[in-house]
UniProtKB/Swiss-Prot annotation:
The keyword RNA-binding applies. The keyword Zinc-finger applies. Residues 468-484, 561-581, 591-605 have a biased composition (Pro residues). This is Branchpoint-bridging protein. The gene is BBP. It is found in: Nucleus. Its main location: nucleus.
């Protein structure tokens, strides 16, 4: 009994330590004993080590521990059965072509077998998950490595088609529509440089130019590529909105992508290494932007002349600038050296009024039967008589002058209410008129019925005539008898009346119809000289008998007879003239202003 209790206490003492496994697997071996009986030990084949699992949940059987100098098993290489040790003599081009062909076949075999995920120690960190509009994850491990293998195979196939003659891609290869490349912009290293502005250029022209040169599509993506408040809602853009600022280059050809990458990298390197004041790309962009906005200064030396420029160069610049300005002709005034938008006579219609006067003179000459002015004959006459004043009447195009035509026409506010159609000058006083108008007025003073003949003769000889006398020194024209009432044309308007003296000078059937239809109205201030109120007597060749005691038409006019008077009118005497009217009663002579005293230059006041 005591021996049993002592053995139990000894067993508890041996198993009292925690975490110890004191249960023997076999019979204790003693030094003095022989080897243990292997049959007495428990059988270990029944214990199975559970397999480990990958991160994605796939089972992985334990194998031999991999060492750094050991090579793993390559199932794809075993399936290809292609030699990897080249013992023959190959050129570098042949060796490169064989390596490309081998890698293409290896990738194709991996895609067929689905062995696309590399071992765990060769993987890169997984990116944040991304989901589509349906909530399905798009950047799984299999999708990412499959995309990488397909892009690598596409690049290798394009190289193989250029290096290997008559090369045919694998059967399961489908050429993608477009490939893309990413070029990151170092905004974190250079925060003060506007890379986006230099990549885009003025209104995006620099970016369009790079796209035309390379043939690839260039886009700017990432943080900072879109202004705040102008975000886009499309899913592809939102997927890269939080990435670093970069240029996304898309094309179907690898060479185009390489060319676009080179151009983009060149702009980035220039902006980061060249100072802002010496960056020619930025200067040209600013100049182009100013031209588009309309604020460009069109100078030969934009931005100031360099300090090292010599005097000859400055003279050449000034000559070129002066030649350019002298070639500019204003179409408003005809002068040189300024544009029409800068003309001082813009809106004054100077050339229009001069042309209107010239056209009016030509019209009057044509109506008078003199015809249109022949500029060739007039130039010849001016060349023969250089002292004439007709040069001023020629247009600048005939005289060869570059000066602007002078506007001699008075404004409408200074013309007054007169119906004087000959008052077209720019002078304020009535006696200070152009030679043409003064000669015309003098002819109207001296006319004796044949107005147009004298007017035409004096107008043609006005340049060679003697200086005119002032109005108070001119001789008084002879008085003419007033026309009878039946020859007066009071039913016409005031400015269309015909001169009474012309009606008395010639008979209506002997008068020139051409001159009768185009008579001029004398000025208002000369009408008093033609309206001399004399005693109503019959014109020469007419009888004293007629209507109311006035002279009537003579009998015997071819085809006409004396019309009888109205009933009762022949017995009524004419009404007496109003008292005090000179020239009506025949006793009072016509009064004229007295001549000025000696030594007085101006007219009497």
């Amino acid at each position: 009994m005591s021996s049993t209790y002592s053995s139990i206490q000894r067993h508890r003492k041996d198993t009292s330590s925690s975490g110890s496994n004191t249960t023997p697997l076999a019979r204790r071996r003693r030094f003095d004993e022989g080897p243990a009986d292997p049959g007495s030990a428990p059988h270990l084949d029944s214990f199975v080590v559970p397999p480990t699992r990958h991160d994605d949940g796939t089972k992985r059987q334990p194998g031999r521990r991999k060492q750094r100098w050991s090579h793993g098993e390559n199932k794809v290489a075993d399936l290809l059965q292609m030699p990897t040790a080249l013992t023959g003599h190959l050129t570098p081009e042949q060796a490169e072509a064989y390596a490309i062909y081998y890698r293409i076949e290896e990738i194709s075999q991996q895609l067929r077998l689905g062995d696309i995920v590399p071992p765990e120690d060769e993987r890169s960190p997984s990116p944040p998950p991304q989901y589509d509009s349906m909530g399905k994850r798009t950047n799984t491990r299999d999708a990412r490595y499959t995309r990488q293998l397909e892009e690598e195979r596409h690049r290798l196939i394009e190289r193989a088609q250029r290096l290997i003659p008559n090369y045919r891609p694998p059967v399961d290869y489908h050429k993608p529509a477009k490939t893309q490349e990413v070029v990151y912009i170092p905004v974190n290293e250079y925060p003060d440089i506007n890379f986006i502005g230099q990549l885009l250029g003025a209104r995006g022209k620099t970016l369009k130019k790079m796209e035309q040169e390379s043939g690839a599509k260039i886009c700017i993506r990432g943080r900072g590529s879109v202004k705040q408040g102008k975000g886009r809602t499309d899913i592809p853009f939102q997927s890269t909105a939080e990435d670093d600022l970069h240029c996304l280059i898309i094309s179907e050809d690898e060479e185009k992508i390489a060319r676009a990458v080179q151009l983009v990298q060149q702009v980035i390197d220039t902006a980061a290494s060249v100072p802002e004041g010496q960056n020619e790309l930025k200067r040209s962009q600013l100049r182009e932007l100013a031209a588009l906005n309309g604020t460009l200064r069109d100078d030969e030396n934009y931005g100031g002349a360099p300090q090292s420029s010599s005097g000859d160069e400055m003279d050449d610049r000034n000559k070129r600038r002066n030649n350019f300005m002298s070639s500019i002709v204003c179409h408003i005034c005809g002068s040189k050296g300024h544009f029409a938008r800068d003309c001082l006579e813009k809106g004054t219609n100077a050339g229009t009024s001069e042309n209107a006067d010239r056209e009016y003179d030509a019209l009057m000459r044509e109506l008078q039967g003199e015809g249109v002015i022949d500029t060739a004959s007039q130039q010849q006459s001016i060349a023969q008589n250089p002292n004439t004043n007709n040069v001023s009447k020629l247009p600048p195009a005939v005289t060869g002058s570059n000066a602007a035509p002078i506007n001699m026409r008075k404004p409408m506010s200074e013309r007054g209410g007169s119906f004087d159609r000959f008052d077209r000058g720019g002078f304020n006083q009535s006696n200070q008129r152009e030679p043409q108008q003064q000669s015309h007025q003098q002819n109207m003073h001296n006319t004796n019925g044949n107005n147009y003949d004298r007017y035409d003769r004096n107008f043609n000889n006005s340049s060679n005539s003697s200086p005119e006398l002032p109005p108070w020194h001119r001789p008084t024209p002879p008085s003419q008898p007033a026309a009878p009432p039946w020859l007066r044309r009071d039913n016409y308007k005031k400015h269309d009346k015909v001169s009474v003296q012309q009606s008395m000078q010639q008979s209506p059937w002997n008068r020139d119809t051409r001159q009768h239809q185009h008579q001029h109205q004398p000025p208002v201030h000369h009408q008093s000289m033609f309206n001399n109120n004399q005693s109503p007597i019959g014109p020469p060749g007419m009888s004293s008998s007629g209507f109311g005691g006035y002279g009537g038409a003579p009998a015997g006019v071819p085809g006409m007879s004396v019309p009888p008077g109205p009933p009762g009118l022949s017995k009524v005497p004419p009404p007496p003239p109003p008292p005090g009217v000179p020239g009506m009663d025949g006793d009072q002579p016509i009064r004229h202003p007295p001549p000025p005293p000696p030594g007085v230059i101006g007219p009497p006041k």
